[in-house]
């Protein structure tokens, strides 16, 4: 789950980090009111969970409440990388002396947390890595040991702060807060870009990003509720799949994919790519899928406007072919049939019974996965 900037900054504030005054608005009138309350110049930030908002016109500075109102009327409804602007974060404009970069991620290769710090901020860390890799410091933290003072000192020194000054203490507290957020909220990313030193001498995060592991959302009901109220970059189909309990990822192709097991599903996607097609999704119904799970999974793709063909690749170990066929039958019955072509390759437990059930629906069963994938791609092109 990707948090909006205002949500991420609320977390930072909760952990004692100073942030500029600001609130989120859903109408131009609210934007004007917040700007009046803040006083002076304000920054309007479109709340969409994608990078590059500024280049797309999603970040503007307003000197007066009226200017903020006018800018907001244009900003609401903007499409930024496929996401529509429905919220604007209005925050006090801050003059800065310098900008830095600081993030915390999970390094899966070493199974440790990894801080990335650079005295250069406000630009993509990937760009810094390409042009000035020597400017990036990597500090690994073993989760079994936790964050220690020597970790913090190493990071803060690299960012250019003098020991035991007020700025040193502020920067140190930000490092500690980011680590605590990472651990407490099961995050995959905690980032401030830029982390800034203001004209007043404060160290504050001008921007903040937090991504929480979707598999840990059950531990954070307030975030689950926020995601339900505002799906952000999660499609309606992904939200539905999450509620039903199977794994679904939205892609940009037109061949719908259903498999049982992550490995088989990814291999099925590879086959579609191999024959020149483009998968519309990743959908894993898991092992031992019941009739109802298959039914709900198929309904997602039957309703998806971009899906032209549905390719089901099922290996029946603990998953029974007749249960899968029954799920297909139930989905078509509930949806009143479909004009979309369904291609099925199914092997294993109760395979013959499943074949007979699908034959009654006019759906042929393919023996070979390559042949089935090729047929699915051909039908999508037709």
UniProtKB/Swiss-Prot annotation:
Keyword Transport (UniProt): no
Positions that bind ATP: 45, 52-54, 94, 99
Co-factor remark: Binds 1 Mg(2+) ion per subunit.
Binding site for substrate: 260, 317-319
Assigned keywords, A-Z: ATP-binding, Ligase, Magnesium, Metal-binding, Nucleotide-binding, Tricarboxylic acid cycle
NCBIfam families linked to this entry: PRK00696.1 (NF001913), sucCoAbeta (TIGR01016)
Protein name: Succinate--CoA ligase [ADP-forming] subunit beta
Lineage: Archaea, Thermoproteota, Thermoprotei, Thermoproteales, Thermoproteaceae
The gene coding this protein: sucC
